[in-house]
């Protein structure tokens, strides 16, 4: 029985969202126009796509918050700083998609939209960094690969941004799918028992 259980493929708690819904919807929106010449805010600024864009952002924001808090529970992480960053990141993303991106008609609102959308993944990355520091206390060696993957993802995002000179749809798709995959990877590590607390 134990051997059969070990052979089972890993299934994450939110695999339906992680593997299909969130990245799939992002890909659909990004594919409406060029991945490299525009971004989701511009693509979805027309009236027909605004509702879909808002629903996508709300879904993604809630998903990232719930998944991250689930990982916090697995890792027995209760520090307020990380939780506050997650709430703020999710709130920023949801607020961003609810603010219409109309730089010609409402330039100040457009600036706020861009700022909130930019800060959301940055704050989430900050929360995950605090979480990794906490769970690495038991054995940093065990989480070395998790740290490396985080730096690679962040370095890749920075490289895409510097190459393009602005936030394009490819970068948005990269960040969304990268975060989905990284959260699932952390869940797999924690559920294997590499956690400061085994009481979960």
Regions found by a protein language model. Give the residues of each.
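Membrane-interface helix-boundary motifs at transmembrane edges
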Residues: 4-10, 69-83, 133-145, 192-199
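Membrane-proximal helix-loop-helix units in multi-pass membrane proteins
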Residues: 89-146
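Non-cytosolic membrane-interface motifs at loop->transmembrane helix junctions
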Residues: 42-45, 105-118, 169-178
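Terminal transmembrane helical module of multi-pass membrane proteins
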Residues: 133-200
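Transmembrane alpha-helical segments of multi-pass membrane proteins
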Residues: 80-94, 145-155
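Juxtamembrane "helix-exit" motif on the non-cytosolic side of transmembrane helices
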Residues: 70-73, 98-106, 134, 159-167
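N-terminal topogenic module of multi-pass integral membrane proteins
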Residues: 1-77
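Hydrophobic cores of alpha-helical transmembrane segments in multi-pass inner/ER membrane proteins
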Residues: 17-25, 52-67, 119-130, 176-191
